[in-house]
């Protein structure tokens, strides 16, 4: 009988596994853009530990192994910012990214002050864009990241997250 993947809040001791997973999972993005200086690949372990302490960080576990992760925070205007959603390459395409996305939306909305969710991905990242559109996100803009990648900015209203969770 196979193990199931569980999603929970990350602990400080998960930092190294998240760091390694992030580096592995974002290789395909770097290859897609021909740019290995994208922020998820250049982030330091200390910086990641700071995010673990300050933000909502969730992990997906298969046994003791971290196989997925996502981060989020809510700013003063009620925007839940979702970042660095990543899934181990061997588990991509099986719905784990969608589960992590729903879980972080629920966690960020739990405080009651979240009015919208915002995230971004590279303009060539079709699988990411498909995932986000399917989850109810729409394009609201774009910008060029400091590493030169053209980003697509997507949002959805927090109430849409509740509707999506009920209908999913």
Model-identified regions with their sequence ranges:
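Conserved GNAT-fold acetyl-CoA-binding loop/helix
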Residues: 19-48
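Conserved beta-strand-loop-alpha-helix junction that forms the acyl-donor binding cleft
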Residues: 89, 118-129, 145-150
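Conserved GNAT acetyl-CoA-binding A-motif
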Residues: 108-121
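Conserved active-site alpha-helix within GNAT-family acetyltransferase domains
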Residues: 98, 113, 123-141
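A short helix-loop-beta-strand connector motif used in the catalytic cores of GNAT acetyltransferases and
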Residues: 47-59
């Amino acid at each position: 009988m196979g193990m199931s993947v569980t999603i929970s809040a990350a602990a400080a001791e998960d930092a190294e596994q998240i760091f390694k997973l992030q580096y592995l999972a974002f290789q395909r993005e770097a290859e897609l853009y021909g740019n290995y200086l994208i922020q998820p690949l250049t982030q330091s372990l200390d910086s990641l530990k700071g995010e673990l302490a300050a933000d909502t960080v969730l992990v997906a576990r298969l046994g003791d192994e971290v196989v997925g992760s996502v981060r989020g925070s809510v700013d003063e205007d009620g925007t839940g910012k979702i970042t660095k959603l990543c899934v181990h390459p061997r588990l991509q395409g099986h719905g784990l990214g969608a589960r992590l996305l729903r879980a972080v939306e629920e966690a960020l909305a739990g405080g009651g002050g979240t009015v919208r969710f915002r995230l971004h991905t590279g303009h060539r990242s079709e699988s990411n864009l498909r995932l986000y559109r399917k989850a109810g996100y729409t394009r609201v803009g774009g910008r060029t990241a400091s590493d030169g990648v053209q980003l697509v900015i997507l949002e959805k209203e927090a109430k849409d997250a509740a509707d999506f969770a009920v209908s999913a």
